[in-house]
Amino acid sequence: MAESESPAIVIDNGSGMCKAGIAGDDAPRAAFPSIVGRPKMPGIMVGMDQKECYVGEEAQAKRGVLNLKYPIEHGIVTDYDDMEKIWHHCFYNELRVTPEEHPCLLTEAPQNPKLNREKMTKTMFETFNVPSFYVAIQAVLSLYASGRTTGIVVDSGDGVTHTVPIYEGYALPHAILRIDLAGRELTEYCMKLLYEIGLNFSSTAEREIIRDIKEKLCYVAIDYEAELKAYKESSQNDKSYELPDGNTITVQDQRFRCPELLFKPAFIGKEFPGIHELTFNSIMKCDVDVRKDPYNNIVLSGGTTMFPGIAERLSKEVSALAPSSMKIKVVAPPERRYSVWIGGSILSSLSTFQTMWITKAEYDESGPSIVHRKCF
């Protein structure tokens, strides 16, 4: 069996970042933006060995002359040609491996359309000729990475936020909830807040600047109203940020008004529940006998949960909704930005997992639909 000889490749396809590496490592070797850029004016970049498309960091560096596209929206691949370019870049440029020689584990958001998995499977076997393949649900991997098999994962990345109760290693599908509000919406909202104070950022290139401001300066207020009041009374919490052109801007109460959107989606006119209500509703859909465990093991995962103060605030909000006798514990592992990848690395290097792979022979016999039988 080929699997045992070479280590597996683990790729966590996020809407914003693609994380990739070798199973058994404790962190991904590559993490690059899931972006494909094509020249706005083909043929104008003379003498630069112009390519028809750029991927990841390179696309970001040349963003001024490119049109940028994210092939994954809300956790679902919307453009398979671009996605193929990202995977190709991943194997050959970032990891420098030949996919024909390694089993490959990919991740996906829960409640993804069946067709999405089938297309992933088809691409991996037919375009990249991998010897064996598996698709795992992101939230389950995050829980493994935190050393638990039971709990509820609040996973918020760039494109989608979901709450996934997991019991003894299995996601409870009837209790999974998801909202299409995550990092990308926060970036857009931050853009809107800065526009209110006269700063206009609108192009795809400038959006990356906003994303950086959001990641470096924003935080979640424990008490939103009190924080607003404090900012009105003094300006000592203002932070300055230097733009790429050398100008400096001052970011004020936008610092906490931006991530507040996670708790109050109504700010942008969405009728979604906030992440605290989502967590509570998800737990309430579980069987009454198993609710104690998820309340006590709320595990945060994904880049959008990296805001300072988010764990304390979520704990406070869920406590207000839950029965008063219930013990609430929010776990925020420091490596949660990569916890999905880490879980994938752990899972695919277990000896007990080696029989779970979909092999090329099984694929040839059953076609892409084999993925629904072997990966759940």
From Swiss-Prot:
It is an enzyme of class 3 (hydrolase). GO terms for cellular component: cytoplasm; cytoskeleton. One of its GO terms (molecular function) is hydrolase activity. Pfam families: Actin (PF00022). SMART domains: ACTIN. It comes from the Eukaryota. Keywords: ATP-binding, Cytoplasm, Cytoskeleton, Hydrolase, Nucleotide-binding. SUPFAM superfamilies: Actin-like ATPase domain. It is found in: Cytoplasm, Cytoskeleton. It catalyses: ATP + H2O = ADP + phosphate + H(+). InterPro entries: Actin, Actin/actin-like_CS, Actin_CS, ATPase_NBD. Coiled coil: none annotated. Its EC number is 3.6.4.-. Belongs to the actin family. PANTHER family: ACTIN (PTHR11937). Actins are highly conserved proteins that are involved in various types of cell motility and are ubiquitously expressed in all eukaryotic cells. This is Actin, macronuclear.
